[in-house]
Each structure stands twice: as C-alpha cells, then as structure tokens.
Amino acid sequence: MKKFIAKLLLAVLPIAIYAGIFVAFEPNDYFGLQGKDTMITRVKQYGASNINSIILGDSRLAHIDMSLVNTTAGREYYNLAFGGASLEESIDLVYFAKKANPKLNEVVLGLSFYTLNASYNTQNRISTIEKQLKNPIAYMSNLQYNTQLATALLGALRGVPLQEGVETSEHTKEDYEQNGEALPYRKDLIAYASVLYNKCAKPNTLTLAKPTQDATLAGINANEISAAQLANEMLKVTKSSSLWSVNEQQLMRLCELGDYCKANDIKLYFVLPPMDISVRELVCAPLGIDKAMLDVIEKLKANDAIVLDYEWTNAPSYKDTQYYDGFHLDTVHGLPQWTKTLFTDIIKG
C-alpha cells in the first residue's frame, strides 16, 4: 500500500508542480492571485461588479484612467476593452454583459477604420472565454495560454519587467529631422504609418518600408531609409492600391446592436477615438479610406445611433507629442485630455 501511495504521489507530483507554476505565472491572472488587469480578469469580474455602464473596444480605450472616467462622468463605468479586440468581439461582449448584468443600461463602444477593415481578421475569443470561465481545466489545457505562460516565464527569468497599459514617451529635436533636414512628420509616426499599409494596401505597395515599425524606424535612424522619401512614397499611393473595404457584416451587426439596445433601454454610444494627422494624410487619404468612413458614420446615424466621432468629423487639434504612435494617444500626454473630452460629451447627452 505504501509503495502504491508513493508511486501515486510520484505520478501526481509533476502535475502539481505544473499547476503551481501555471497559477503563479500565467499572464491572464485567471485565478485572480496576481492582481493583474487583463482581458480575462475584466470579463470574469464583471458579473459581480453591479456596474451598469460599460466601455468596449481595443487598446485605444483599454488604457484609459477609470478613476478619471468616473470622476468626469459622475457615475461608475466598467472597462471591458482590451488590446487587440476585434469589432466582432466587442459586439459579442455587449450581449455577454447583458446576460451577466440584466440591469446594464449604457454601452460605450469604440470602433475605427482599422477595426472596420474587412481584412482585419482575428480569432473571436469571447465564446471560448465564456466556456473557460466555467472550466479551469479547459483554460489550463489551452495551447495559446500555455505559450503565453512560457513567454512570461522566460521574461521573468531574464528579469524583463512588464509595463501593462503604459504607452508614453518624450521627444527631442532629433525625432523630427534626418541628416539635418526637417521631416514632414516625426520619424516614428512615418514608420508607424508605413506599417498600417500591411493591413490596408496591396502587398509591396511601399518599396522603402520594412515589415515592422521597429525595423523601419531602425532603418531610418541608421540612414538606410530616407524618412522623407518614404513619406512621399505613401502620399503618391492611389486608391487603386487599396485593399481596405468596410466589413459590411460587422457594420450590419452594429446596426442590429443599435436596435437591440433600443429595445432593451440601453443607451449606446459609438465612439471613434482620434488619430494623428500623419495617419489621415499618409494612409487614409491616399487609399480612399476617409470617404468610405464618412459613409459608415452616416449609416450609423441613420439608424438613430449616437456617434461621437473624433477620428474624422470632430478631430481634436492635438499636437503630435500627445500621440504615442499615429493611432494611440500617449497615456500621459494625450489620453487623459481626450478622456475628459469624451465623457464630458457623453454626460451632455
């Protein structure tokens, strides 16, 4: 009997060690022991929050200061936005939130030309997460989360700190010139705009850009790429090179969501966060995205939706230093200001 117990303990020991490591280091804090703010913790904790106003969207809304939101609005909001969220996932989360909290009465849903792009496809994780919230074993056996665990462990062993939600930087004169010549936009903004072409234009539309923002910026800093020539190349691109089109299926779902919210006494706001002028001029105008998005806004308004548009028709005149990159506001220098603007507009009705 003792030998059997010893063998059993020996067999169970690796599983116990693995479970302990998983619980301690898995990056989504499924078990709530690490005090992290992740997509899964936000979804998991919403049902017990008793908060009737929610925010949804991708990273442009995921990092807003919730204490500033609540102070500005004079009521409490719960943030269900997360980095990399597709429009499909955000819409699905509205229905999830209504099931979790039947008293839900307000939804602030972020969207943009990027998430409305028909070629922007991500795996919809919401139904999977709903199942895994009820089944920890399914969560622990998920390949994607185990890969994330390995990455987190490797980072911990290397002493690499995690700075979740922090997107801020300071800029100097060198960021605006190359070889002593002034540039039309900040170097990193030019590099970032070139990367957006990977999602919005035909392959090889740009001959000077590299596949990633970091690689392009490194090429600019090493004088291997002329930032001015790259910007000019983007300006010369025509609509014929565009692969961008409206995701009509998700646009229809947005309209259906409007009808659902109206039928259930939920106030729905569609919010288009601001972007730097470099994205508008280098990406959207040459590829014809701007005109198509104006049509989208009109369709949403025609469905009696409340549209708060800071991307196109009501773009704030922020300095480029208030943007971390062309698409995301700096979490220190820009995002707080826009957060106040957004929720001041919301309480005005």
Language-model-derived ranges and their functions:
Residues 125-258, 262-264:
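Secreted/periplasmic serine-hydrolase-like ester/acetyl group-modifying domain
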Residues 53-57, 80, 329:
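Short hydrophobic beta-strand that contains or immediately precedes a catalytic carboxylate
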Residues 285-349:
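C-terminal regions of proteins
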Residues 258-285:
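Active-site segments of SGNH/GDSL-like serine hydrolases
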Residues 24-45:
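Alpha-helical transmembrane signal-anchor/signal-peptide segments
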Residues 60-149:
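Membrane-embedded segments
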Residues 39-66:
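Short extracytoplasmic
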Residues 6-26:
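Hydrophobic membrane-insertion alpha-helices, especially the h-region
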